[in-house]
Amino acid sequence: MKRFWFLFFLPLSLAAQDTLLIEGRTFVDTLSGTSYGVTVNRTRPVKFIFRNNSVTGENTVGYMLEAGQENVTQYTNNFRGAEITGNKFTWVGDQNANTITHGVFTGYHTDVRVMYNYLDYVPMGIIRKSNGMTDSTGVVAYNIIRNPPAVGVVVKGMNGVRIYNNTFYSEDSLYVGPGIGTWRGLIDIYENDNPVGSAKGAKIKNNIFYTKSQLTNINVMNESCLDGFESDYNIFWCESGEPMFMIAGSRLTFTQWRARGYDLHSMVVNPYFINTVDLVPERRMQWGTPTEFNYGIAASDYWEAGFYPTLVRQGEYWQQGARVYEGDIVIFYWRGKLFDGDTTAIDLKYGKIVINQGEIHIQQ
């Protein structure tokens, strides 16, 4: 097994506000079997920040960033309030649906903020796990999760997890046999069975879900997880038919999902990504709902170790997905007519149309 160990020898009087910062580093793990990847010492309570790093791996078992535990230990919640932001995680191993490599793992720590990251082919992308602990200020927001062989985000036995303004994109197929396709959702929510822990009150808003096949977008595995569950103001698109969902093992179409009371304000619309790497919508997707997390990734930005992504503030009309367009929409024209009903009111020679927060301004 290969591990990247970070050992910080801290005084016995260490305070909870002390900071453990890993920033601007490049990690490449070439072990293809079991590897624990970037493993961080969690024996003391600290403010853990993992920022603007690049992590590449090909391990089929283990982690890319191990910043949590699989069970209750004496180190539980030592990383409460951790921040994992602006990183790029790239997995280059065998594209097999049986691969269980955990990308960003923060088990048994609450209020963790996982934001502005790019995950490329990471088998199990972002894992929020516990024995029924409750998240109150944490969030999974403004991440791009591209082509996860298994699942994009997992909520296992943790209450109150918020999943806002992420972009999910998958070219995968449905599971047809061992190692081929995935049976999981882009988001999986389920109880922890050992030790038993609930996963209530998850909130899924302002995300973009794009699939080539009729994969499951949101998979709520236990009926009990619907207690306090909310999903709305999202964008869904499937190239092969109606977007699909699952509750307690039953597959549901978008129509059936909405009949259960979910995603009533969401839309099925193609975001027309400019390309399938940067995942920038061709136009603004701005039918979202405001949250406290009001900065997204600039449409023109990219990830590089040591550099923080450029962030753009949301406007009055909330944009969905991880990318946020800056400024007004401007359309230049050469000749035109302005109509009032069926009557031509004004001949337009040349100028521009500026669309700002729903208001249209014609400038000549």
Where on the chain are the PLM-derived regions?
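Positively charged n-region of N-terminal signal peptides that target proteins for export
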Residues: 1-3
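Hydrophobic h-region of N-terminal signal peptides that target proteins for export
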Residues: 6-16
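Right-handed parallel beta-helix
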Residues: 17-30, 44-59, 70-95, 102-105, ...
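Extracellular beta-strand-rich, repetitive "passenger/adhesive" scaffolds
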Residues: 25, 262, 332-347, 351-364
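Structural detector of coil-to-beta-strand junctions
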Residues: 33-39, 61-64, 95-96, 101-103, ...
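Short, recurring structural edge motifs at helix starts
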Residues: 38-40, 69-74, 189-195
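Acidic glycine-/aspartate-rich tracts in secreted/extracellular proteins
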Residues: 212-214, 236-243, 297-300
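C-terminal accessory segments
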Residues: 256-332
